Amino acid sequence: MFVHGPEIREAALALVARGVNDCEVARRLGVPRTTVRDWRRPPYVANFDRCPRCWHRLRPLAFCDADYAELLGLYLVDGHISAMERTQRMRIFLDSKYTNVVDEAEALLRRCFPHNPVGRALVHDGSEAILFVHSGHLSCLFPQHGPGKKHDRPIALEPWQQRIVSAAPWAFLRGCIRSDGCVFVNRTGRYEYLSYGFANYSPDILDIFESTCVEQGLRPRRYTKAIRLNRRDDVARLLAHVGVKS
């Protein structure tokens, strides 16, 4: 196999930087076009970074505070991480009738994990949508992962997670409500008004949701397995920041 010298490679990259296409570069320097293509592309290993928690190699992620906070809400409420042979898989379960919620949640996963497999499946005769992503570092990103159901064990945010939720509280609330919340019309006598509801079996997750609401000046009403927000100004702010499920 013939190996071209570094001066040829440097000359090729200089021509590419000037906007010359691969075919013309190959013709001028007398090298195969595929060689020019390989020189132009960064090596595949450069697509890897280091996990900030376990320090093992991982494909680069693209989390901003708002995206992570929203995905954390989706995961805590109706997400599950499971171990596979060589990686981990996170599944998020959503009601398929809310097509915009499902589409936007899938786009969120693809945005956060641009180099990892992301997909969608419909189950239960199409009534439930399952979004999934594969990564060996999901339990690093979501340390609430553990054996058994979340409502059967303690759930608490780590300090770095709390900082993100405090920086992007509305995104976190949006993830929770889109996963297992609702907007409904409350009727009391001759009065009708909108209310937001959020339900979960885990008292710890309800605590996190409630405290996030309180930090934003909202006035939630706590029940055993649910939280409601029905004051007019609170609902107006939630409509502006969270929206409705559709």
What is the meaning of each model-derived region?
Residues 1-246:
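Internal intein/HINT superfamily modules and their associated LAGLIDADG
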